[in-house]
Amino acid sequence: MSKLTVVGSINADLIVHAERHPQPGETLLGSGGEILAGGKGANQAVAAAQLGANVAFVGAVGSDPYAEPAMYYMRTSGIDLGAVEQADTNTGLAVITCLLYTSDAADE
């Protein structure tokens, strides 16, 4: 098994489902909000672990409610989090925008 140490960011991705993308200045109500693990380094570490590597991670999260969800998939993927520090600050956050377009002709 390959050994790998990843040094990078751990963020919490905030995902809210909406019926459509808002217009400039418009407020839409969302539903089904989720907090998922994210961050370039964390995503790379999880991918490597899922491919069978023995992964250790070096990074930091904040001491706020987003820290645990941000590390959830890393922990459940078997990544060694012994070098992850918990800083007296906020965990990095990202708001994810994803648009899915389908053609009316694709009613299969």
Specify the residue positions occupied by each region the protein language model found.
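A structure-centric signal for secondary-structure junctions around beta-strands
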Residues: M1, N90-G92
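Glycine-rich phosphate/adenosyl-contacting loop at the front of the ribokinase-like
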Residues: M1-A60, P65-P69, R75
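A glycine-rich helix N-cap at a beta->alpha junction
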Residues: S77-D88
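Short beta-strand scaffold segments in enzyme catalytic cores
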Residues: L93-T97
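Conserved small/polar residues in nucleotide/adenosyl-binding loops
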Residues: Y101-A106
